[in-house]
Amino acid sequence: MEEEVAALVLDNGSGMCKAGFAGDDAPRAVFPSICGGPRHQGVMVGMGQKDSYVGDEAQSKRGILTLKYPIEHGIVTNWDDMEKIWHHTFYNELRVAPEEHPVLLTEAPLNPKVNREKMTQIMFETFNAPAFYVAIQAVLSLYASGRTTGIVLDSGDGVTHTVPIYEGYALPHAILRLDLAGRDLTDYLIKILMERGYSFTTTAEREIRRDIKEKLCYVGLDFEQEMQTASQSSALEKSYELPDGQVITIGNERFRCPEALFQPSLLGLEASGIHETTYNSIMKCDLDIRKDLYGNVVMSGGTTMYSGISDRMQKEITALAPSSMKVKIVAPPERKYSVWIGGSILASLSTFQQMWISKQEYDESGPSIVHRKCF
């Protein structure tokens, strides 16, 4: 009966946590990675006001709370809050006892060593996990696409990375990080909608803007051409009804918003766009493997969900690459959750079972065991 216990797979992103059971094809729980504590000491004594809220509940009570994002740019920066999020994940979302299941966590590329040790320590000491493993997010996305070699462009809410992977191993010297992702695009959308005279101020409206961004924005194949079309006709205009019944119209903002991924200068950032960052990452790799990378550019994360993004990537990278090079962009439809899906696949492989760090190994070697067993 030993085999019956499913491993737990937790993908903690800057914006959303994805959690579920290994072997499933989608996460059971997806909720915002936020923690909130009351702004004022409880005036209402005995009203059962909790001292902390996590996820959707924190989101809905944000008026009376101070909200914190414990994961910034993909890296955990506040361990107390992170622990609360994990506790909430196990007990409230998945309703499991963590001491009964192996736990697979994901980490950002280039996650500092001390962070990996801290994750390991919390899982074994606070949650008493029987076994644990930590895997790099981009590597899991690549597995989910059925590959072991390729370059992953992983763009979520808080950070974007380009990660070249060869035979299942990420190549750290060639990983590049771009601090431009979904949250920045949402903020940019507010800014350009304000130029149109629509104002959004509260956090509640941040959710609305995110919804507008996800439903109406797209990436243009040729930015100048799209701008011209937009200025000459209203063919590109779409309307959106706000919760209060007000209808707003959005035109060139639809493609100007995600254009910032290719032209960060629109946000006032001196950085390369995602196409150039991908190219630069490939150029940092050995000559012999570049062909395999150009032929397997895998998109992952919520910010790669815009329609038109793969055609545009194809066009931009083909322009940068050597002329004879075959460039292939892979954009799986489930890429919003492909990190989690890759984790679910990995943790349920029979060959992976000897890779877990067991509680016994942890007790013998301490947190540094993670560097020997997970790479």
From Swiss-Prot:
Its EC number is 3.6.4.-. SMART domains: ACTIN. Actins are highly conserved proteins that are involved in various types of cell motility and are ubiquitously expressed in all eukaryotic cells. It comes from the Eukaryota. GO terms for cellular component: cytoplasm; cytoskeleton. The lineage of its organism: Eukaryota, Fungi, Dikarya, Basidiomycota, Pucciniomycotina. Keywords: ATP-binding, Cytoplasm, Cytoskeleton, Hydrolase, Nucleotide-binding. It comes from Puccinia graminis. This is Actin. It is found in: Cytoplasm, Cytoskeleton.
